[in-house]
Amino acid sequence: MTTLKITPAKLNGSVCVPSSKSMGHREIICAGLSAGTSIVDNISMSDDMEATLRCLTALGIGFQKVPSERSGRTALAINGSGNVRVSQSTVDCGESGSTLRFMIPLGALCGEPLTFTGHGKLVTRPLQAYYDIFDRQGLSYTTASNGYLPLTVNGVLKSGDYELPGNVSSQFISGLLFALPLLAGDSVLKITSALESQSYVD
C-alpha cells in the first residue's frame, strides 16, 4: 500500500481558470457587432462556441484564431463591421441553446430569409417568447410543426416597446439586447415580472 503524506502549507502562484462559456458567447457576439477588429482572449472552445462562430460567419462577421497570452487557451480576432447581413442562407446552431436564442434577433435585422437549424434536443427547445414578438410585429417566420426547428426568419424587427416575462431564459433577453441597439429608433425592453437570471443580464 502506498502512503501519501500531506504537509500543510500556504499556496502561492497563479492559476488560469477556465473562462465562462456564457460570457464567451456574449463577448464574441459583442465584438462581432462592433466596428473594427477586437481581440477576445482566454476563450474555452467547445462545440457550442463553434456554433456561435458559424452563425457570426453567416451574418457576414469574420474571425481568425490568433496567439493567446495564456497557455492552452484560444484567442480570436473578430472583424466586426458594426452591422449584420446574410452571407449564408442557413446556419447550424448545433446543440447550443445560447447560440440559437442569441442569434435569432440578429437574424431578424437582415431583411432576408435566414434559416436556423440544430440537432438533438435543441430542435424542440421552446422559442415562443420570440414567436410572440414576431406575431405582434407582423414579422414573417416559418417553423416545423409545434414551433420546432428549422426556423426561417424573413423580415426586420421594428424599434419600439418590447415585453418579456422575468422568468424567461436570460438568453432571450440577451438576444434582444444585442439586436435592439442596431435598430434605427429607440426601443424599450420591459421585464414584466421579477428577473430570475439577473446576473446574466447585468
Predicted features and spans:
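Structural preference for solvent-exposed beta-strand-turn elements
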Residues: 1-202
